[in-house]
């Protein structure tokens, strides 16, 4: 791989420049010919991304002869500037490919263009870059991930069967500038509108437990007839469950989420959470890494259509 070898030389030249950057978790290769792939995630305070990282590391360990892995993430879901700095660090260090779950669908595009201009293969996972912004920058980045709208619609349809026409519901959205938050909200709306429910509130919970709790509490306070809370991820659903309990309305207000993290499973079992969607966190980064390896080898990813490699998403309910 001439491309990989040339990038090794660049990495050696700039190695000393990296000491002041954020700490990295790395799995080192035995030979310099193997490509180095950087996995850049969103908040590692979110169980979903820790599971994603664990899955990627396990895959690298099983395929240590094929590539090196460098992984990192940010402290909270809205720390876009830190994620930009991490990508800049990866460019300077001379990685061969970047697999990224962007904290913002638009703000990360300029630094991704820098990576592409530096000859780095870029693969987008989890949260899709805004296609219009990519087009404006005249770049293309493949997206490897699930249909978030479809997944949220499945959850919403399951909930709707347990409500009555005209029931009031609230939607707790993720970070509003992210495509996956927008798509999940759209899927929830699809299901609620089709079933004749009344969406009385839509607010952002920033993907986080505390913010999700605050938003859910406000909705419950403002809308005493609220029958359900649809959370764009399980972290916010955890916050919503606490808010429902604190309001003395356990069993009266249904809660659904998205991601199927470990912390939500006991709540599915005892009914505190009605349903969630599994987009297979442990495999998501792996799907992206597999795509990056194919692109580095000059191959076309399987099942790619219009720049998208769709991965599974499934409804999960009480066992």
From Swiss-Prot:
SUPFAM superfamilies xrefs: Periplasmic binding protein-like I
Q: Which CDD domains does the UniProt entry name for this protein? A: PBP1_ABC_sugar_binding-like
A GO CC term attached to the entry:
outer membrane-bounded periplasmic space
- Top-rank lineage group of the source organism: Bacteria
For whether the record's keyword set contains Transport, the answer is yes
Q: Where in the cell is it found?
A: Periplasm
Point out the signal peptide segment: 1-29
Tell me, what is an example of a GO biological process annotation in this record? transmembrane transport
Keyword Transport in record: yes
Task: Select a single GO molecular function from the record's annotations and give it.
Answer: monosaccharide binding
**Alphabetized InterPro entries for the sequence:** Peripla_BP_I, SBP_2_dom
Q: Which UniProt keywords apply?
A: Periplasm, Signal, Sugar transport, Transport
Q: Disulfide connectivity? A: none
Q: Tell me, what does this protein do in biology?
A: Binds specifically both D-ribose and D-allose, with affinities in the lower micromolar range.
Q: Which family does it belong to?
A: Belongs to the bacterial solute-binding protein 2 family.
Name of protein: D-ribose/D-allose-binding protein
> What species does this protein belong to?
Pseudomonas aeruginosa (strain ATCC 15692 / DSM 22644 / CIP 104116 / JCM 14847 / LMG 12228 / 1C / PRS 101 / PAO1)
